[in-house]
Amino acid sequence: MSTAVATRKRAKPAPGPGAAPVAGKRRRKVDSAADRGKSKGGGKMNEEISSDSESESLAPRKTEEEEEEELEETAQEKKLRLAKLYLEQLRQQEEEKAEARAFEEDQVAGRLKEDVLEQRGRLQKSVAKEIQAPAPTDIRVLRGHQLSITCLVITPDDLAIFSAAKDCTIIKWSVETGRKLHVIPRAKKGAQGQPAGHSSHVLCMAISSDGKYLASGDRSKLILIWEAQSCQHLYTFTGHRDAVSGLAFRKGTHQLYSTSHDRSVKVWNAAENSYVETLFGHQDAVAALDALSRECCVTAGGRDGTVRVWKIPEESQLVFYGHQGSIDCIHLINEEHMVSGADDGSVALWGLSKKRPLALQREAHGLHGEPGLEQPFWVSSVAALLNTDLVATGSHNARVRLWQCGEGFRQLDPLCDIPLVGFINSLKFSSAGDFLVAGVGQEHRLGRWWRIKEARNSVCIIPLRRLPVSPVAGS
């Protein structure tokens, strides 16, 4: 009995919930024995036992508290990183706002400077160097008149062109499509009542700066006022005693200036259908007239060889000399400077404070004729892009020439030539400066000294491609 009890193995109690498993202890003992055995014999088994299982057993185990602490620190770091990122974004936004404010202030300052220079008549934007000569295939030709084009105007929104000719008609064209929008036909002579059209050569036109009124003048001494949108005739101004050769609206108003071969300058109010006053001073037929915002106008005196500035309120005039021939065309560049052309082939730049030209370009379009008898090509039209240094001139030498005015308008340099056959009787820049319109005829607008048979009576739209306008420079 005692022997049986001594040989029987005592049952081991089951491990408690917190006790380490016994198998683990045995495994470690077995592993240790195996290590000892293999360390003596070497071999493949030694490599397997010294791998992951051993490293895992030797690596310190992280408690749950340590893991939670690590996770908690990571969240804090994330919050800190997001906070720094948010602050950086705020800083960048404030910098951008500051840059935008500075840019707006610069823009406002630049605009104010432009306004001051414009009011003083000294604004000169530099655009001429950026103009690229168009290819002949880019020029659009609009045909509809039977005789030579004499004058044209562009609406203030640059969407339509009015052209007039020796055939006594006026045509309104679409700039975009080139189609006729309206035709004002020739009026029959002797028709009873007020004719809704011209019965003689239309020599000049003008459109108000709001695009409401169109004025046209002819050889029969009449000025007709039209509603520009519908081309409906409104009324007729009479009073000139010879052909009406120049018309211009004062910018921002409905005050109309007219000039005539009767040597006078008249002032009208188109909105009120009224005559205001007449000014005298020229000694020969006046050929052309122009005006801007000031209550004054400039005239080209033809054979009397003078350019005159008329101060309407003071009823006074300034007289300028410089050309040697008949001054046939004139155009204001800004309130203080103008350009004129004459039949002696010269183009002149003027400042209102100087009685002589600031710059004079002789033989601006070259010479023609037999050797020893050469004569300069007449300058039949001039145009200027408002408040810039870009000028265009026309003649009958088969080209329109673009010019750059130097600083202070003291120099005139040629830029490029645009091929157009015929008399260039009228030139106008669009207000945006993206195209130039030329009125071409077989004859000069004021006579029939030559006839160019190969020319086509037409309106030509010349695209002007250029880089963005450079910063403003005032003289």
UniProtKB/Swiss-Prot annotation:
Residues 65-74 have a biased composition (Acidic residues). Acetylation at Lys-12 and Lys-25 by KAT2B/PCAF under stress impairs pre-rRNA processing. Deacetylation by SIRT7 enhances RRP9-binding to U3 snoRNA, which is a prerequisite for pre-rRNA processing. It is found in: Nucleus, Nucleolus. The modification Omega-N-methylarginine is found at R10. There is a cross-link at K113 (Glycyl lysine isopeptide (Lys-Gly) (interchain with G-Cter in SUMO2)). InterPro entries: G-protein_beta_WD-40_rep (IPR020472), Rrp9-like (IPR039241), WD40/YVTN_repeat-like_dom_sf (IPR015943), WD40_repeat_dom_sf (IPR036322), WD40_rpt (IPR001680). GO terms for cellular component: box C/D methylation guide snoRNP complex; nucleolus; small-subunit processome. A motif (Nuclear localization signal) lies at residues 8-40. The modification N6-acetyllysine is found at K12, K25. GO terms for biological process: ribosomal small subunit biogenesis; rRNA processing. SMART domains: WD40 (SM00320). The modification Phosphoserine is found at S50, S51, S53, S57, S470. Keywords: Acetylation, Isopeptide bond, Methylation, Nucleus, Phosphoprotein, Repeat, Ribonucleoprotein, RNA-binding, rRNA processing, Ubl conjugation, WD repeat. Pfam families: WD40. Residues 1-75 are annotated as: Disordered. WD repeats lie at residues 144-183, 197-236, 239-278, 281-320, 322-360, 374-413, 419-460. GO terms for molecular function: U3 snoRNA binding. Its main location: nucleus. The WD domains are required for nucleolar localization and U3 small nucleolar RNAs binding. Component of a nucleolar small nuclear ribonucleoprotein particle (snoRNP) thought to participate in the processing and modification of pre-ribosomal RNA (pre-rRNA). Part of the small subunit (SSU) processome, first precursor of the small eukaryotic ribosomal subunit. During the assembly of the SSU processome in the nucleolus, many ribosome biogenesis factors, an RNA chaperone and ribosomal proteins associate with the nascent pre-rRNA and work in concert to generate RNA folding, modifications, rearrangements and cleavage as well as targeted degradation of pre-ribosomal RNA by the RNA exosome. Interacts specifically with the U3 small nucleolar RNA (U3 snoRNA). Binds a sub-fragment of the U3 snoRNA surrounding the B/C motif (3UBC). This association with the U3BC RNA is dependent on the binding of a protein called 15.5K to the box B/C motif. The association of the protein with the U3BC RNA was found to be also dependent on a conserved RNA structure that flanks the box B/C motif. Part of the small subunit (SSU) processome, composed of more than 70 proteins and the RNA chaperone small nucleolar RNA (snoRNA) U3. Belongs to the WD repeat RRP9 family. This is U3 small nucleolar RNA-interacting protein 2. The gene is Rrp9.
